[in-house]
Regions:
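Short, flexible loop segments at the rims of nucleotide/cofactor-binding pockets, characterized by
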Residues: 26-28, 148-151
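Short aromatic/basic micro-patch
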Residues: 108, 140, 182-183
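Conserved nucleotide-sugar donor-binding
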Residues: 136-148, 186
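Nucleotide and nucleotide-moiety/phosphate-recognizing core
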Residues: 2-135, 143, 167-176
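Conserved alpha/beta core of the MobA/IspD/sugar-nucleotide pyrophosphorylase nucleotidyltransferase superfamily
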Residues: 1-3, 151-192
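Internal, well-ordered alpha-helical segments in soluble enzyme and binding-protein domains
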Residues: 113, 145, 155-159
Length: 192
């Protein structure tokens, strides 16, 4: 990763279908929030911020550095509120040319996936992982677009509507590195 890229982990959801906040769920004895933070760090992202909402105090208690946390006060409004809170917080940081947006419920997207997408960083980048041609996460957003995306982010669609308008969106094929599969229900985790 030549240009500095911030990591933005969205982990504020209540996990209604899951039966509780996914950030607190464990895979191989590790909470998903810590696994995702480690993955962002191993991919070379710095700084890394984690957006919290549901069970915020419990998630904060797990973080090795609570200053990484950004509270999305209106997290119940959906992923858009979390994305807005995270991008707004990153605006105050100097250095990163782009933000790599990662979701807490993607434990099988490893650092190699994240690093491959992050390698396309620039202030004007709009890129996302694809798995066998199907768009997925993480999503790389150049700093130039952060305020515009924060204004457009709403509901559970996050940046989806904004991304749909982009003719410059680059799909970065990662199907050889992972599946992009997410955790929707507890049964999606091994041993459940």
């Amino acid at each position: 990763m030549a240009e500095p890229v911030a990591g933005l982990l969205l982990a504020a959801g209540a996990g209604r279908r899951f039966g509780g906040p996914k950030a607190l769920a464990e895979l191989d004895g590790e909470p998903l929030v810590l696994r995702a933070l480690r993955t962002l760090a191993e991919a070379g992202c710095a700084p890394v911020r984690v957006v919290v909402g549901a069970a915020a105090d419990e998630v904060l208690a797990l973080l090795p550095d609570p200053s990484q946390a950004v509270r999305a006060e209106d997290w119940e409004a959906g992923m858009g509120a979390s994305l807005k809170a995270g991008l707004t917080a990153l605006e105050a940081t100097e250095g990163p040319v782009a933000a790599l947006v990662h979701l807490v419920d993607l434990p099988w997207a490893g650092p190699d996936v994240l690093a491959r997408v992050a390698a396309h960083a620039s202030t004007e980048t709009v890129a996302r992982a694809a798995y066998d041609g199907v768009p997925g996460h993480p999503v790389l957003l150049g700093r130039r677009w952060w305020a515009e995306i924060a204004d457009a982010a709403h509901g559970d669609r996050g940046a989806r509507d904004w991304l749909a308008t982009r003719t410059d969106l680059r799909l970065v094929e990662c199907g050889d590195l992972g599946s992009g599969r997410d955790v929707d229900r507890r049964a999606d985790l091994p041993g459940r």
